[in-house]
Amino acid sequence: MEKSPDTFALYRIVGNDLYPRHKKGQTCENLKFILEHEPELENCEKKWIVNRIIDKEEELAIITQLHHHEQPFIHIPFHEEAYKVIEWDMNCLPDPGYLVSKEFENLDSEVRIRFIAAMYQLKNNYVMNTNGARNKALRDGRSRVKWILPWDGNCFVTRAAWKQIHIDVTASPHLKYFTVPMTRVVNNKQLLADEFTPRPVEEPQLIFRDDSIEEFYEKFCYGRRSKVELFWRLAIPGEWDCWKDDPWDQPRRPKSSEAGQFGAAGWTARLFSGMKKLEQDNKASFKQRGLARLEGIISTLRHVDVMIAGKSADSNTLSMYREDVLKGEERNYRSGKHLPHIDQLIADAKEAITRAPYSVTDKKSLPPSDNIHDYWHPAPYWWPNPNTKDGLPYIRRDGKRVPGTHIYEKKSDKYDRSRLQRVFDDSIILAMAWKFTGDKTYAKHGARILERFFIHPDSRMSPHLIYAQVRMGRNRNEGSGTGIIEMKDLYYYLDAIRLLKSAGVIKEDSFTKFKDWLSTYLTWLVQSPQGKKERMAVNNHGTYYDLQVASIADFLDNHPLLFETFIRAQSRIALQFAVDGSQPEELKRATSAHYCCFNFQGWVNMAEIASKWGIQLWSYRAPNGASLIKGAKWLLSYAGKEWPHKQIEEFDVERFLPIWFAVPQHLIKLPKSAKFPKSKYTVKPRFFPHDGVRPYWNLGLSRRDYH
């Protein structure tokens, strides 16, 4: 082997630009610079790997340049269908509840970014394919030359650099590996000057002899020691020997049998990334580069998720009612094929028009803040303390509601809960009545409700729920996190707004102000003590928190938050469902049948929003074996049977039906005990608001009738 000719093959792997680590278009710029200025290298052929470029225009520009310069290349294409089936890596979670734990909430920003990047590592490995492309180069080169250089696409080799590499490698042909340290430049043209002096102190590239046994470990993804992992196995010393692992990192593999069989050879240059502040040779810049790289990876992968889903979804697309199904139902209605549900919908809409638009300023009592604009509602199960003179602090009596806290009951006008529910329910009914009839009278009344409750300064609600579910004598008489659930039905109200906007009855200025209101409320929802507490809830409150955040983020085009919420929601499946599909947290309640159905209905709604963006929660199986499908099977197994767990109030057994018709039909069979109707249209369209079923749930529903 030592006497065989010293032939070389330099492979450059051209991948995706990652903003903010790279300037957009930097890959093409650097490729052009190399092709136009890099000299021929003695005994070395050059070849390129075009590695899963997402942007088809960018990919074409790269390939066109390579063809123009008659450069050979291997093309590894990006396939959307292959990417679609790749999930977030839930196996890296230290425990199923980690994303809703205090430990996660308290992570500093740098560690949090590293963890989120770890959740994306399976997607990262496909899109970036860093070690996969390096190994592709290695395998291609080993059959053709003695020395293979599987290098990054931004490596530039000057004549002087190559001369030194060639000297060092040929002087020690008994070695199987060589490290080639890198020098950074902030202006590529520096490399064209004869007097250029390198400072090669950056993480090296590697040279492999054709009989070397090692390859890059493809489970280590880009941005998290993809190359360093091989340094460790080959015992190549460097600052990486002091690096610590996070609990979610891939485990290190043992030393190679070829450890120590390496030398150092010359140097190479790393071309400019387009981000000058990240190209300094100091520890601060090194740290900033690492964070920018991870941010770029996460941003790029979220962009891919949105790019693929965006072909059929955007913020204007309905989240809960499928537009193609609604159009079919609308055509049938207008052609005279009246469904009883639509007739009932129109009747409900006519009744809604008789009710004046609502406002929080209509309530008969003031919140602890004395601000009439603040939403106000006491905690429903918290009563005066019989053991104290003033009744403070209040105590909990599960299953026993405080008068006025039950929707629409007598005295509920003292508070805002019933009024808020009217806003949600009347608005979606009015919007859908317009959709089916074309009569803008309905839509205009829906727009008036929006104006009075959310827009007009004299009547608008403050964009927070600080005084929702107040437990007097506790928490400075501010509400707890549990009060956030009172806004749970916002998700279908946002569909009502989408429909009203398409009807042309919402003024552009009002629409902008409503989005501003939502944005402020969303900030409070994410950052407030109540929001943080509710986010960490392990029961139905956590489900409905995620549903709110996801629906608002969807409406506002806040894709980073939207996909962050999808990840957190998916992680809750292992937390909320046992392997048999039961819901341990909900079974603790005095009205467990209600809460099991209520929580699962939240999951039905969450799965609908997620599917709009290409995330299939129904097909997900958690590492512990839990899944929504198992949850549905467990819950529906009690249809037609007596509920065996605690349930101190009467339970509406028809609540199983919206769940049954929502579950993808190919994933579940009808329980033998259940005597379910075959058509969703034969089931009642409205349930009590506490049940969590949206009004007219069976209109615009994508699932076909059961046969």
Regions found by a protein language model. Name each.
Residues 1-36:
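N-proximal low-complexity "stem/linker" segments adjacent to membrane-targeting elements
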Residues 123-126, 138, 156-290:
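Conserved catalytic core of nucleotide-sugar-dependent glycosyltransferases
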